[in-house]
Amino acid sequence: MPNLYEKYVLPRLIDAACSQPPMSKLRSRYVSQARGEVLEIGIGSGLNLAHYGAGVTSITGVDPAAELTVKAAERADALSVPVSVLGISGEALDLDNNSFDTIVCTWTLCSIPNPYRAVAEMYRVLKPGGQMIFVEH
């Protein structure tokens, strides 16, 4: 169970730090390239949601941090495409093989204990000919 800092302070700090103009510029540049059915690994507070373009038909976001995904669900309400947020890790995606056209992962691999497993899972659920969009530091 998260302590008070993890539940209330840390999510706000992460959201504030990750919404700074340089990061928003990169989000806009890369996330806007997504198309079709999208899987976002590490949706967090949903900062990428505003940057998806008209070619996106649905978004499934995964993140094990429930404290962050509350804000993502709020931001999803402003979109015209269906968005579902799942409280699962990118290392163990309970999703069908070959089910997404685009996978987006921004500033997330560094926080996943086994990034190799997460990338293997992403590849498993990516449709043939699909694209992966990574932004990392």
Model-derived features: where do they sit?
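Class I SAM-dependent methyltransferase Rossmann-like catalytic core
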Residues: 1-21
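Conserved alpha-helix/loop element of class I SAM-dependent methyltransferases that forms part
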Residues: 17-37, 47-48
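Class I SAM-dependent methyltransferase SAM/SAH-binding core
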Residues: 39-41, 45-92
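A short acidic, Gly/Pro-enriched loop at the edge of an enzyme's catalytic core
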Residues: 91-103
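A short SAM/SAH-binding and catalytic strip from SAM-dependent methyltransferases
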Residues: 101-114
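A short glycine-rich, Lys/Arg-flanked "PGG" loop and its adjoining helix->strand segment in the class I
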Residues: 116-128
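Conserved beta-strand signature within the Rossmann-like core of class I S-adenosyl-L-methionine
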Residues: 129-136
